């Protein structure tokens, strides 16, 4: 018998034996030690989050999820996942951020292009260790076969879905803390009950992965459903909550601005209406108020959103271009305010 045929025959016999004994060949489990240990794994594959990294096919106990209103990053597609260790579950805390057990992980991959042209750029992971959360960025290779740890970050030239050529920035490890920080501690910022679908949370509840369905769940609108006939205020407030409030809130990285752009904030002055900036400068564009009712073009908030120039642009990190759709919704919200 030729060697190749002998190997094939052996494989068939082995498979037949496994089937005869009721053995199911399962993919390797997620590497809990890589998540909870002290080391920083050099490659994304060491975690075992995906059965197929290129296809972003999640492994067992890795759950895909989506946000009603997602954070905008130069038009990148975001593929979001959470991993929960065996027997662990999420805990709902009102409409706010879900509480994750130690050993959990949050995974987010950034991609550009569609179909066969889709290119994975980076995957960011948040690891919940005993001492707190750790944020690590991983950069995908050109072959799309592996992502390697990029503690120093990096830049990639690419074209956005809007056709704009940009230098896309992968944040370094310390820059991850700029957004993922409150009161000096690294925290998740995305999976809040108010910004997750009731269907997804119901599925997690049924699977024993969520302790309860909290009141106030899914109160933020689905951004993809916005039309010119939609009320501007809830969409604008949701956009500001997701894109700005991780810094602009008490305890956030920009709390000294005095702005609190969280969804639940109801004080008009706190969200910028008729509020003068704490510190002026070219970032104010010569304007006097963060939000001037009825006058979007005289509002500092919109001026900074509508810029990609360093020192003016807001957010400071995570974008190299302007989100025209986001600007349009916030512009309409301000324009429709009573003077």
What are these regions (language model features)?
Residues 21-33, 97, 115-339:
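Sequence context surrounding c-type heme c attachment/ligation sites in exported
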Residues 79-91:
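Short, structured beta-strand/loop micro-motifs enriched in basic residues and often containing a Trp
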């Amino acid at each position: 018998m030729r060697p190749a045929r002998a190997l094939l025959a052996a494989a068939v016999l082995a498979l037949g034996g496994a089937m005869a004994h009721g053995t199911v060949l399962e993919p390797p489990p997620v590497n809990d030690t890589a998540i909870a240990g002290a080391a920083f794994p050099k490659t994304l594959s060491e975690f075992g989050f995906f059965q197929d990294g290129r296809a972003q096919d999640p492994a067992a106990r890795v759950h895909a999820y989506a946000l009603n209103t997602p954070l905008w990053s130069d038009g990148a597609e975001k593929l979001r996942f959470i991993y929960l260790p065996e027997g662990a579950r999420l805990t709902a805390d009102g409409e706010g951020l879900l509480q994750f057990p130690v050993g959990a992980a949050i995974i987010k991959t950034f991609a550009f292009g569609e179909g066969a042209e889709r290119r994975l750029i980076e995957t960011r992971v948040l690891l919940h260790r005993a001492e707190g959360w750790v944020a690590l960025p991983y950069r995908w290779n050109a072959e799309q076969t592996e992502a390697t740890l990029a503690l120093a970050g990096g830049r990639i030239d690419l074209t956005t879905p809007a056709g704009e050529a940009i230098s896309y920035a992968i944040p370094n490890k310390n820059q991850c803390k700029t957004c993922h920080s409150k009161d000096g501690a690294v925290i998740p910022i995305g999976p809040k009950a108010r910004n997750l679908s009731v269907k997804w949370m119901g599925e997690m509840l049924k699977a024993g992965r969520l302790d309860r369905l909290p009141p106030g769940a899914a109160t933020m609108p689905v951004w993809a459903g916005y039309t010119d006939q939609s009320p501007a205020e809830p969409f604008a407030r949701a956009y500001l909550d997701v894109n700005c409030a991780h810094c602009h809130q008490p305890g956030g990285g920009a709390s000294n601005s005095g702005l609190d752009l969280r969804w639940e904030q109801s004080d008009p002055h706190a969200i910028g209406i008729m509020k003068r900036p704490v510190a002026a400068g070219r970032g104010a564009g010569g304007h006097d108020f963060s939000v001037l009712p009825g006058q979007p073009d005289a509002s500092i908030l919109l001026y900074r959103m509508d810029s990609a120039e360093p020192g003016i642009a807001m957010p400071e990190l995570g974008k190299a271009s302007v989100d025209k759709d986001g600007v349009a919704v916030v512009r309409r919200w301000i324009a429709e305010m009573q003077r």
